[in-house]
Amino acid sequence: MSQIKYKRIILKVSGEALAGEKGTGINPEVIKHLAEEIKSVHDMGVEIGIVCGGGNMWRGETGANLGMERAQADYMGMLATIMNGLALQDGLENLGVPTRVQTSIEMRQIAEPYIRRKAMRHLEKGRVVIFGGGTGNPYFSTDTTAALRAAEIDADVILMAKNGVDGVYSADPKVDPNAKKYSELTQLDLISKNLKVMDSTASSLSMDNNIPLVVFNVNKPGNIKKVVMGENIGTVIKGDK
């Protein structure tokens, strides 16, 4: 059997990916598929932390653009990420995968508060940990949350699970047929080429802590396992400069 390349991962799942073709809400079939994909990697002994976005329900930036106070709008977005996390927890536990949800905003009736050392212990015991509520602070994206949690738990990689996009391109491949797919980039490449993979705060955190990223299509069965095993199916963004 091939060697596992990444033994402790942060899987960043966008809210849009959970919505499926509808674009909004939570698609139970998508949850089921994603849970099965995660289980296949969990069964290999990989330690898995997950950060969900909330864009399938609400975006703080959109609310702010409509006249809401930005902090208030962002808190609503944080709650959306927790709803997504609970749905994914249910999908995983239906398959027998022990899963804990930890939130940066306390709501003890439904989830544990985020405690780094407790999260590490869960991972060591073979439990999947879903980090909900973003960083707990407005003005920070869930991409930044993924980079922050990856640094805190000493993850080997951040897997950027994309909805139907199989990597990073020089332009939108749906619009530009000549768009070039990159197999490998650095964090500085993202800035110099203006490639919208993650926001600058998340990118800086990843670069400063030397955490690589892999951008890949999560919709294709087996892709999470392929990435964990080191197959070149997406775009690798090296953690260094």
From Swiss-Prot:
Q: How is the activity of this protein regulated?
A: Allosterically activated by GTP. Inhibited by UTP.
Binding sites annotated in the UniProt record for UMP: G54, D74, T135, G136, N137, P138, Y139, F140, S141, T142
Q: Which UniProt keywords apply?
A: Allosteric enzyme, ATP-binding, Cytoplasm, Kinase, Nucleotide-binding, Pyrimidine biosynthesis, Transferase
Name its GO BP terms in alphabetical order.
Answer: 'de novo' CTP biosynthetic process; UDP biosynthetic process
Compartments in which it is found: Cytoplasm
Q: Which residues bind ATP?
A: K12, V13, S14, G15, G55, R59, N163, Y169, D172
- Cited Gene3D superfamilies: Acetylglutamate kinase-like
**In its keyword annotation, does this UniProt entry include Protein transport?**
no
Annotated spans, Involved in allosteric activation by GTP: 20-25
Taking the first listed entry, what is the main subcellular location of this protein, grouped into a coarse class? cytoplasm
Pathway linked to the protein: Pyrimidine metabolism; CTP biosynthesis via de novo pathway; UDP from UMP (UMPK route): step 1/1
Q: How does it assemble?
A: Homohexamer.
Per its record, how is this protein called by name? Answer: Uridylate kinase
The species this protein was found in: Lactobacillus gasseri (strain ATCC 33323 / DSM 20243 / BCRC 14619 / CIP 102991 / JCM 1131 / KCTC 3163 / NCIMB 11718 / NCTC 13722 / AM63)
